[in-house]
């Protein structure tokens, strides 16, 4: 007879409790708690702000302290440059891409809860497009000045940009804990140069957190106005910045100007007319944290399934697809144009196809880099890369060299020249090899236009003479000299050709000022200029990848330097090699590498005179033929060495 053992009923009750526990866990996710916290804060308690500062004045450190005080990050952890996500940002101490972080803060004076959005912006002029979009998302900004250095060039440039956009500015002096600082002097600089009231200035130490919670956070609450958007209007968002994720595609940093948007909503971009579905949505806290919705006044991220970061146009308006006709596009959109170009070629032509795929992947994360294929008669297939400015080019070039090292030949940077023809047409030239030569100029060209910049430099007075001489030798035109204080700090303004700026002007400035000068600049438009194309010729054949466009006054000096330098890297041949520099169809410099002689008489008897003459004549004729029809072999290492500074 079979016996059955019945299990106690209590096991079933245990399973029920377990199931109930799982349901409870599901309904209280961190994202939902976060969203519930946001819902309880009214729009008038939102504060969107950024930090305006020169390099190394403590912007990233102050950001870290704010995140710690508002409990976004653990104050006990070793926090350093939390908002600087890119490796190059951490290495150079600069911000390249705009970042944001949401913070919850309870005002101890009133007990009210506030939602703060810190928008960390790039400070350099190359990324001024990102800066202006970031500022447009803010109600105010912290104007941060280093107590040991005072006002610097980048501080001035970013102050005027923020001021022109109507931002409420909070002047803050950082590093007041250092013994060798003169806080009173820096206060005078701020009052005299920016006309801000002295009583509004706050002294802090971002490193130790001194006065950050006690004075700075209350000032952000009291002085910066809340966002002015309308929650009841149709949804529209300003696209502030974007970055590329290998799994999600382009991730968009957006400011919700009006209305609200939820996950799975159908949206459209005003400039590209492309339609998308919201795949993910949330805030940066400090990394991506899904919340399911964003509403008026918030700054957060959207994932729309964009496969290419170039689909994300900075300054574009994102709207609900169903309410396009009811929604007004946000003003001020402007496509960013590259201002510095370089050529890049694989040292071994066989690797072009593999490197082409790698190059395409590299530019995915930086929509402002333009990439076009080009072919050089000397270096083979390659690419022409366009950048926003000299720092942008330098950062990307550094990345290329880290990735590929000696596998890549990168030409000298050049700027776009505007050619005005006699028939009234205009053409922008970004490749020096395409620049009209002397013969074309005499027939078809009315004028050449060169891009200029307005440079702002701050430096100690003792280096003023050296810096003025440097600017004058680079075809500079002085605008203004301002003495910032009695301690000898000077602000110098100059018009300079952009071509000189990209030719290591900043390095030369640091050299003549022993590292004490700072530089910032802005676009000053095009001017008519007497520029010509300089070509390097080897046995009469121009090396297209090495062509440069220079002012007429510099051509002879650079031409002589070129031929001497290139001669060092070209090996001797069996025939004579002539290296020349040509401009306006005239040879302005020449160097000759003598032929390497082969001993054809080695096996002859000393008395065989007729045979000797015959062999020497044959050798001479052969060399002449080789020079006429043969191509000189120049190693890729020669090009790399020549292009190296």
UniProtKB/Swiss-Prot annotation:
Q: How does it sit in the membrane?
A: Peripheral membrane protein
Predominantly, its location class is mitochondrion
Task: Read off the InterPro entries from this record.
Answer: EF-4 (IPR006297), EFG_III/V (IPR035647), EFG_V-like (IPR000640), EFTu-like_2 (IPR004161), G_TR_CS (IPR031157), LepA_C_sf (IPR038363), LepA_CTD (IPR013842), LepA_IV (IPR035654)
Compartment(s)? Mitochondrion inner membrane
Q: What class of enzyme is it?
A: hydrolase
Residue span(s) of domain tr-type G: 44-228
Q: Which Gene3D superfamilies match?
A: 3.30.70.240, Elongation factor 4, C-terminal domain, Elongation Factor G (Translational Gtpase), domain 3, P-loop containing nucleotide triphosphate hydrolases, Translation factors
What does the entry list under GO cellular component? mitochondrial inner membrane; mitochondrial matrix
Q: Which GO terms describe its molecular function?
A: GTP binding; GTPase activity; mitochondrial ribosome binding
Q: Which reaction does it catalyse?
A: GTP + H2O = GDP + phosphate + H(+)
Q: Is the Magnesium keyword given for this protein?
A: no
Supply the Pfam families for this chain.
EFG_C, GTP_EFTU, GTP_EFTU_D2, LepA_C
For this protein, the Enzyme Commission number is 3.6.5.-
The residues listed in the UniProt record as binding GTP, with positions renumbered to this chain, are 53-60, 120-124, 174-177
Give the GO terms filed under biological process for this record.
Answer: positive regulation of translation; translation
Record's keyword terms, sorted? GTP-binding, Hydrolase, Membrane, Mitochondrion, Mitochondrion inner membrane, Nucleotide-binding, Protein biosynthesis
State the family it belongs to.
Answer: Belongs to the TRAFAC class translation factor GTPase superfamily. Classic translation factor GTPase family. LepA subfamily.
Q: PANTHER family this protein is in? A: TRANSLATION FACTOR GUF1, MITOCHONDRIAL (PTHR43512:SF7), TRANSLATION FACTOR GUF1-RELATED (PTHR43512)
Q: Which NCBIfam families match?
A: lepA, small_GTP
Give the free-text miscellaneous remark of the entry.
This protein may be expected to contain an N-terminal transit peptide but none has been predicted.
What role does this protein play?
Answer: Promotes mitochondrial protein synthesis. May act as a fidelity factor of the translation reaction, by catalyzing a one-codon backward translocation of tRNAs on improperly translocated ribosomes. Binds to mitochondrial ribosomes in a GTP-dependent manner.
User: What's the protein here called?
Assistant: Translation factor GUF1, mitochondrial
């Amino acid at each position: 007879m079979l016996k059955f053992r019945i299990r106690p009923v209590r096991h079933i009750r245990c399973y029920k409790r377990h199931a109930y526990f799982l349901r409870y866990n599901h309904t209280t996710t961190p994202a939902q708690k976060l969203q519930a916290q946001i819902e309880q804060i009214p729009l008038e308690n939102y504060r969107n702000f950024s930090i305006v500062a020169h390099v190394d004045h403590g912007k990233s450190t102050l950001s870290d302290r704010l995140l710690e005080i508002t409990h976004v990050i653990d104050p006990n952890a070793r926090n350093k440059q939390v908002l600087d996500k890119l490796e190059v940002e951490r290495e150079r101490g600069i911000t390249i891409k705009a970042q944001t972080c949401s913070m919850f803060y309870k005002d101890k004076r009133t007990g009210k809860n506030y939602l703060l959005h810190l928008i960390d912006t790039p400070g350099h002029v190359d990324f001024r497009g990102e800066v202006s979009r970031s500022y447009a998302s803010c109600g105010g900004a912290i104007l941060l000045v280093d107590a040991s250095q005072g006002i610097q060039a980048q501080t001035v440039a970013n102050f005027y940009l923020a001021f022109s956009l109507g931002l409420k500015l909070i002047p803050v002096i950082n590093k007041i804990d250092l013994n060798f600082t003169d806080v009173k002097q820096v206060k005078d600089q701020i009052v005299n140069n920016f006309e801000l009231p002295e009583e509004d200035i706050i002294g802090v130490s971002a490193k130790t957190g001194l006065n950050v919670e006690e004075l700075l956070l209350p000032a952000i609450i009291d002085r910066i106005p809340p966002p002015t958007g309308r929650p009841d209007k149709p949804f529209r968002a300003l696209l502030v910045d974007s970055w590329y994720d290998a799994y999600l595609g382009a991730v968009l940093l957006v400011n919700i100007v009006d209305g609200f948007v939820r996950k799975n909503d159908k949206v459209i971009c005003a400039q590209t007319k492309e339609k998308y579905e919201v795949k993910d949505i949330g805030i940066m806290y400090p990394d991506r944290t899904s919340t399911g919705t964003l509403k008026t006044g918030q700054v957060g991220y959207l994932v729309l399934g964009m496969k290419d970061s170039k689909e994300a146009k900075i300054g574009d308006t994102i709207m609900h697809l169903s309410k396009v006709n009811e929604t007004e596009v946000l003003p001020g959109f402007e496509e960013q144009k590259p201002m510095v170009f370089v050529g890049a070629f694989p040292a071994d032509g066989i690797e072009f196809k593999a490197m082409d795929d790698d190059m395409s992947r590299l530019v995915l994360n930086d929509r402002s880099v333009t990439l076009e294929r080009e072919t050089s008669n000397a270096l083979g297939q390659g690419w022409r890369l366009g950048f926003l400015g000299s720092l942008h080019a330098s950062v990307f070039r550094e990345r290329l060299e880290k990735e590929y090292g000696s596998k890549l030949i990168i030409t000298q940077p050049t700027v776009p020249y505007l050619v005005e023809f006699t028939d009234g047409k205009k053409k922008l030239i970004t490749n020096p090899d395409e620049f009209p030569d002397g013969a074309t100029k005499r027939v078809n060209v009315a004028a050449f236009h060169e891009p200029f910049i307005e440079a702002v430099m701050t430096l100690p007075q003792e280096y003023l003479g050296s810096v003025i001489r440097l600017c004058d030798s680079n075809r500079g035109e002085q605008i203004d000299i301002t003495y910032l204080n009695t301690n000898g700090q000077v602000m110098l303004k100059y018009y300079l050709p952009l071509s000189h700026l990209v030719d290591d002007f900043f390095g030369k400035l640091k050299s003549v000022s022993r590292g004490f000068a700072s530089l910032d600049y802005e676009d000053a438009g095009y001017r008519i200029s007497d520029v010509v194309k300089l070509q390097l010729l080897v046995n009469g054949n121009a090396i297209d990848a090495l062509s440069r466009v220079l002012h007429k006054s510099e051509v002879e000096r650079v031409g002589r330097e070129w031929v001497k330098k290139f001669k060092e890297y070209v090996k001797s041949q069996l025939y004579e090699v002539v290296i020349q520099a040509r401009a306006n169809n005239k040879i302005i410099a020449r160097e000759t590498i003598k032929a390497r002689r082969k001993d054809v008489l080695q096996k002859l008897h000393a008395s065989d005179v007729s045979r000797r003459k015959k062999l020497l004549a044959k050798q001479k004729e052969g060399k002449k033929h080789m020079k006429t029809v043969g191509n000189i072999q120049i190693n890729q290492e020669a090009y790399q060495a020549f292009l190296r500074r």
